[in-house]
C-alpha cells in the first residue's frame, strides 16, 4: 500500500481559571460571592477536505496548539470559550496516538470531523461553591489542562489513474514525463516493485493522481510474481490506463498482451473490468509500431479509445491527458464489495474499554509514595493552591476517594513523603 506518513504534536487549549470575587456595591450589604467560571479551551479538530490529496502541508508545520479559555471575572461574568482549532486533512487519513498505538480517527468522508485533542473545561468560580453552611466561599478551581498528544497521520493515497501493462512497456517513463515523479527506469523487468505516484497536470487546470504500478505477468491473479500486491493497488483506482508496447520490441504480440492483462484483471475481481479503460499505444517512434497498431485496431471494438504516443519523444501526451481528465469527471468511485459495505453499515461494533482506577500508588526506592491516575491528576491540576480553602477541599477529596486509607495499607506513616506529579507533601495520619 502506498502510504504517506507524518508525525505531529497537538495540544488542546486549557480551560480558564475560575475567580474568587465578591459583590461590592453601594446599598447592597452582604453581596455574596460573585466569581465567574473560566471558559472552555479549544479542541483540536481534524476535518476532511476533499480538495487535499497529500500530507505535504504537515511537513512544514508539525505543531498545532489551540487557544486557552478566558479566566472567570468578577460580577459573576464567565470567561469566553475559545474557538476550536480546525485542521484540514485529506480523505483517507488515519490518525494514530504514537504513545499508545490507538487509532484515534479514520477520516474517510468529506466534511467528517474528529476531535483529536480534547480541550479542558473551565474552572468554577467561588459563586459555584456557595452553600448555606458556607455562603461566602473563598475557593475556586483552576482550568482543566487541555489534552496533548503526539500523533502520526497516515494517508493511504488513492490514485485516480492506474497504469497497467507487462513489465518494461514504458509505464515508468510515461509517469516521469507527465508528472514530477522520478521512478526508477531501466531496460529490465520488474524495475518497479512498489507503486510510484505522480500528480499530473492535464494542462487545462485539471489534475489527478497517477500510479505507476508493478508490472503484471500472467498468473498474477493466482499470486504469481507480484500479482496480489499489484492487483490490490489497481482495485483502488477509478480509471485504468493500459500501456502496450506497440513496437513488439521484445517479441511480444500487442493484442495478446492486451487480452492477457484483461484476463488477469477479470479473474482477480470481476468489478475491475467495469472501470473505464484507455489504451495507450506506446513506443510509436519505433519501427513496425505503425503496422502493429493498424493490426491491433482491427481486433478490438471500435468504441475502445486508443492513443498512440511515444513517452520518449513526448508525442501524443496532451491528447492522452485531456482524455483521462474527461473520463475521471464522469467516473464514480467503485465499491469493491457492495454486500460487505452494506453489512458494515448495519453492524454495531462493541469495544471493551477497561475501567481506569481513580488512582494508583507505587513506591520508589527512597521510600517516596507516588500517586498517579487520570482522575487524581485532574483534581490536582484544577486545585488553586494559593487559597487555603481550595487546599482543604483537595484534602477532603483525596480522603473521600480513599487515598488516605490506601496509603496507610501500603505502610505510610506520619512524615512520609507523597508525590503527585511535581508536587510533594507530607503524609499526616
Swiss-Prot record:
Entry keyword set: Cytoplasm, GTP-binding, Hydrolase, Magnesium, Metal-binding, Nucleotide-binding
Pfam family for this entry, one: DUF1967
Region of interest called Disordered, as start-end residue ranges on this chain: 124-145
EC number: 3.6.5.-
Transmembrane segments: none
Similarity-based family: Belongs to the TRAFAC class OBG-HflX-like GTPase superfamily. OBG GTPase family.
Organism: Listeria welshimeri serovar 6b (strain ATCC 35897 / DSM 20650 / CCUG 15529 / CIP 8149 / NCTC 11857 / SLCC 5334 / V8)
Gene transcribed to yield this protein: obg
Protein name in UniProt: GTPase Obg
Gene Ontology CC terms, in alphabetical order: cytoplasm
Listed cofactors: Mg(2+)
Start and end residues of each OBG-type G domain: 159-329
Single GO molecular function: GTP binding
